[in-house]
Amino acid sequence: MKEVAKPLQERFFIPHEIKVMGRWSTEDVEVKDPSLKPYINLEPRLLPHTHGRHAKKHFGKANVHIVERLINKVMRSGGSHYKVAGHFMRREHRSLNSKKVRAYEVVKEAFKIIEKRTGKNPIQVLVWAIENAAPREDTTSVMFGGIRYHVAVDISPLRRLDVALRNIALGASAKCYRTKMSFAEALAEEIILAANKDPKSYAYSKKLEIERIAESSR
């Protein structure tokens, strides 16, 4: 007699809910900013790693999970023009350059610290931080009659997200620069401060500075 194949649930362990890093759910995470909502990817994913398959696609990074995008920003050393108080802060963390496993562990540890301090889902706290740190206006230079002027322009949602994540990672590097604070602790503190709109947050204060300069250039 031919054996009947067992149901898939009996042959393999299939979780009822896929959680990011096996700990945090994205089902109840809410994005209030209508312009950022289409670009903040919160798909349930156990391991936020796409192996760079969106790298050569136009606007492909919009499909990358928001946690992975934070990991990618943490992993970078930053360009030569990114300075805080005259120092290249992110140069202190070259051990994370192009080492995604280590960057993944740093972000995971930061999320644990956020959960312990706030008692809330760290992914939701990250979304709040991004919404508060994403500038709406910036300046660009235009030339009229051989004279260059700075004018205010609106920022696209995808760039708003990029700037917010970059400044969060840069602010974390600044906080642990020449201190005993670990990078994970600094990252957790920066995200919490930005989520609370605290002026001590580098990302939030940078957003206010960018918008203030843009307002004066109207």
Curated annotation (Swiss-Prot):
Which keywords does this chain's UniProt record carry? Ribonucleoprotein, Ribosomal protein, RNA-binding, rRNA-binding
Q: Which SUPFAM superfamilies match?
A: Ribosomal protein S7
Q: Tell whether Metal-binding is among the UniProt keywords.
A: no
Give an example GO molecular function. Answer: structural constituent of ribosome
Which InterPro entries does its entry note? Ribosomal_uS7, Ribosomal_uS7_arc, Ribosomal_uS7_dom, Ribosomal_uS7_dom_sf, Ribosomal_uS7_euk/arc
* Superkingdom, natural source: Archaea
GO biological process terms, alphabetically, are: translation
Q: Could you name the Gene Ontology cellular component terms for this entry?
A: small ribosomal subunit
Q: How does it assemble?
A: Part of the 30S ribosomal subunit.
Protein family: Belongs to the universal ribosomal protein uS7 family.
Q: What NCBIfam families does this protein's entry cite?
A: PRK04027.1 (NF003106), uS7_euk_arch (TIGR01028)
The protein's job, in short, is:
One of the primary rRNA binding proteins, it binds directly to 16S rRNA where it nucleates assembly of the head domain of the 30S subunit. Is located at the subunit interface close to the decoding center.
Protein name in the entry: Small ribosomal subunit protein uS7
Q: Which organism is the protein's source?
A: Pyrococcus horikoshii (strain ATCC 700860 / DSM 12428 / JCM 9974 / NBRC 100139 / OT-3)
